[in-house]
Amino acid sequence: MNYLNILFSIICFNNLFGQFDYQNYKDSILQLRLQHASALIDSSSSILNNDEIKEFTGVDYFSLDTNYRILATFQKSIGKRFRMPTSTERKPWYRIYGYLIFEINGIDGKLIVYQNLALKKNKDFKDYLFIPFRDATNKIETYGGGRYLDFKIPDKNSVLVDFNFAYNPYCAYSSRYSCPITPEENKLLFPVYAGEKIPVGIQNH
């Protein structure tokens, strides 16, 4: 099972309206993080090459904080397809799928939710949505280019958004990759002290 599938299974398990089991939630996230770190140092499956694996010393995270596990309002608003800018010349087709409106620690936030049109054709990812975001921790505690959240097409207007699952794009680990550039509209003016930090032992590209 790959990283995205693990992520989806945990998000689905900790559903919005079910009973919240904090210990199971904590254990599941810790297991996910261990699997992610193990995959990065396994040369047979790592996104890193051998030289980068030697340089890599670990994945760092903010402490788990349920204040960043929030209820948000999802507003579906499908836009026209467009070419998403990336860190290279590659420009994959995306479209805006909707908006998330929420509050964290008394501060209002809004993020655009995107759909990758190539992944939409894959039956395993036809419900996959993508949220690139930046916040006030970038270039200090987190990767300067922002972080990502994965999301599934919801069937309700009230949805669970958990920033403890925020993860780095591949470009945070290696400049060899092509990563979507976080749109300026998805820059949060407040810090999000949850999810992945800058990778340990790797230059912040």
Say what each PLM segment does:
Residues 78-144:
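Mid-length scaffold segments of soluble, non-membrane domains
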Residues 71-73, 103-105, 112-114, 134, ...:
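A structural detector for beta-sheet-dominated domains
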Residues 20-79:
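Start-of-domain marker
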Residues 1-23:
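Bacterial Sec-dependent N-terminal signal peptides
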